[in-house]
Amino acid sequence: MTGDQLRGLIPVGWQGAIDGTVPKMEFEQLARRLGEEQRDIFPASEQWFRALEVTSLTAVRAVILGQDPYPTEGQAEGLAFSVPDGQDMPRSVERILNEAAREDTIAPGRTSLLPWARRGVLLLNTTLTVPRGQAGGHAKIGWQPVTDAILRAVASQPGSVVFMPWGAPAREAVGRAGILDGHLHVVCPSVHPMERRGSFIGSNPFGYVNERLRRLDLARIDWSLD
């Protein structure tokens, strides 16, 4: 895969916002490194930018920002923290859904967060690929300029957006993009759902987001999974 081919995987509606912010060389280097990877890469290449396909730039109301895809076959589906229905539920998903159930109905057996993405929640990771069996294995492969550009594109849109960075890499990415909690955007950082310190469990992030939206006289986000 060439750099141009990699860039061509980005949905057209997002390309215009990213053009000029990520040098061509960055795409070329990233494509080369991905091509040199000897292990299986998750998810499949057609799903690397799935988050952008499902949630258009103009439709983004919130961004849940994670670290990287699941390194187990069949679990990564191109949406941060989401697992196809019918797959084993990772502990991180279990914890996320337990918190979401404080706000809305979560049907038993649901693990895919696709309905959230369709409602304007961009489910993005700071790194969009992972080698089989090694979480964080592509953290330094070159995705950072691309995902940073995506965050800046969202932040530059008119209207308020809620940014929910979960984990240190996600919080750092929001900081690099210059996104601040203030009069326009809402930033609700948290530990990663798998972290033991500063427990995600019981933190009610979804209720907090909806309360912040209420204060801005904006519609709440529907976190249900029917």
What is the predicted role of each segment?
Residues 12-212, 219-226:
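A polyanion-binding, active-site-adjacent surface
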